[in-house]
Swiss-Prot record:
The chain crosses the membrane at residues 48-68, 93-113, 129-149, 157-177, 187-207, 215-235, 253-273, 299-319, 326-346, 364-384, 392-412. It is found in: Cell membrane. Pfam families: Na_H_antiport_1. This is Na(+)/H(+) antiporter NhaA 1. PANTHER family: NA(+)_H(+) ANTIPORTER NHAA, SODIUM ION/PROTON ANTIPORTER NHAA-RELATED. Na(+)/H(+) antiporter that extrudes sodium in exchange for external protons. Gene3D superfamilies: Na+/H+ antiporter like domain. The lineage of its organism: Bacteria, Thermotogati, Deinococcota, Deinococci, Deinococcales. Keywords: Antiport, Cell membrane, Ion transport, Membrane, Sodium, Sodium transport, Transmembrane, Transmembrane helix, Transport.
Length: 421
């Protein structure tokens, strides 16, 4: 069965330009509200997304292990062809979700990274240093543990799988604890996860890319430079950036880089506008786009990604070194790396814990960071072809994410006991 649709990569530009909920054109915010409002919306959106993500993952896993498992795998490979004149691009639905829709998710990730670096918690080096140290530890130790288990084996290429944090899943778990968890820990988790995402993007671009086409790479660079030029020229309408987004995705695809990298590159071209500290500031193009993309990401893209990627059959399965490496990396390497490197930052006086965060709270944060899910599944799909190794990685990711979530809830419940009314 082949489904034909016109328009090439127009979906990338269309979703970029369309917002399902209107963003207010002008608001009057005090400086502190300007800083807190984006995080409050971010936390609520990510927490809701995490709960939907969990449901989609459970559905995929149950479907892949049910008597109707064949229909699940048939749906993943259902071909979809996009055409424009003599040009065609044909792949299974699984590919379109992972390579096109996830480019929009990476666009949102890029927007969040840019916002945090410019006007958020990461804009001051000392404030960012605790999250940076924790993120580094939370990436290096899981990769090291995985490599220790899989060195020299067929699964050695999966060292990047346990490095990243699923911020939506983690904040969804955190939301289950209600208001007992301190605001400082929530902000620190968001900052750490955003830095983790940045690390994952770099890992994908540098280590999971092969066979570069230099001509297409040059065209991609030219398109990106044009986008930066539009930003510098003060173009604030999102339409031209949507067109460039489609061109950037196509040239990135042709270059040999994973096409999701186009989302991050496009995010860097979107104008942020006035400083957030200014009162009576009109929402910038970046804020409008971030606000518009959040519902698409939370309730369409990420659930579809979970549905198409979390379905792993355990029939006849056995414990594999890849599974063990992922589990150890996420539930031991992550919290150990986060706490150890945060402690190092404090000892070096490069950072200090927020007043409302304790070391038991940091351990709970490290366990939340061990919920790898989305990024881990994504990198696993790049590291391994379809088959036993990828299934082993998925099983490890699902197992570790559940164990890390349960452990985090237990630790944080004790670290932040409910206050008597």
């Amino acid at each position: 069965m082949t489904i034909r649709r016109p328009g090439g990569a127009c979906l990338f530009g269309l979703l970029l330009a369309v917002s399902p909920t209107p963003f207010p054109r002008r608001t009057t915010l005090t400086p502190i509200r300007t800083l807190l409002t984006p995080f409050g919306e971010f936390f609520k959106g990510q927490a809701s997304s995490g709960l939907v993500l969990i449901l989609a993952a459970v559905l995929a896993f149950a479907w892949a292990n049910s008597p109707w498992r064949e229909s699940y795998f048939t749906l993943r490979e259902l071909p979809l062809t996009l055409s424009l004149g003599s040009w065609t691009l044909s792949h299974g639905l699984y590919w379109w979700v992972n390579d096109l829709l996830m480019a929009l998710f990476f666009l949102l990730v890029g927007l969040e990274i840019k916002r945090e670096l410019r006007v958020g918690e990461l804009r001051h080096p000392r404030q960012a240093s605790l999250a940076l140290f924790a993120a580094l530890g939370g990436m290096l130790l899981p990769a090291g543990l995985y490599t220790l288990v899989n060195a020299g084996g067929p699964g050695a290429a999966g060292w990047g799988v346990p490095m990243a944090t699923d911020i939506a899943f983690a904040l969804g778990v955190l939301a289950l604890l209600g208001d007992r968890v301190s605001p400082g820990l929530k902000v620190l988790l968001a900052a750490l996860a955003i830095l983790d995402d940045l690390g994952a993007v770099l890992v994908i671009a540098l280590f999971y890319t092969s066979g570069l086409n230099l001509l297409a790479l040059g065209l991609m660079g030219a398109v990106w430079a044009l986008g930066l030029g539009l930003n510098a020229a003060g173009v604030r309408h999102l339409g031209p950036y949507a067109v460039l987004g489609a061109a950037l995705w196509l040239t990135t695809l042709a270059s040999g880089l994973h096409p999701t990298v186009a989302g991050v590159l496009l995010a860097l071209t979107i104008p942020l506008g006035r400083r957030a500290e200014q009162e009576d500031a009109e929402p910038s193009p970046l804020h409008r786009l971030e606000h518009g993309l959040h519902p698409w990401s939370a309730f369409l893209i990420l659930p579809l990604f979970a549905l198409f990627n979390a379905g792993v059959s355990v029939a006849g399965g056995s414990l594999d070194r890849v599974t063990l490496g992922v589990v150890l990396g996420l539930i031991i390497g992550k919290p150990l790396g986060v706490v150890a490197f945060a402690w190092l930052a404090v000892q070096l006086r490069a950072a200090s814990l927020p007043e409302d965060v304790t070391w038991p709270g940091m351990l709970g944060l490290g366990l939340l960071a061990g919920i790898g899910f989305t990024m881990a599944l994504f990198i696993g799909g790049l590291a391994f072809p379809e088959g036993a190794l990828l299934n082993a990685a998925k099983l490890g990711i699902l197992t570790a994410s559940v164990l890390a979530a349960l452990a985090a809830i237990t630790v944080l419940t004790r670290a932040f006991p409910r206050q008597p009314r």
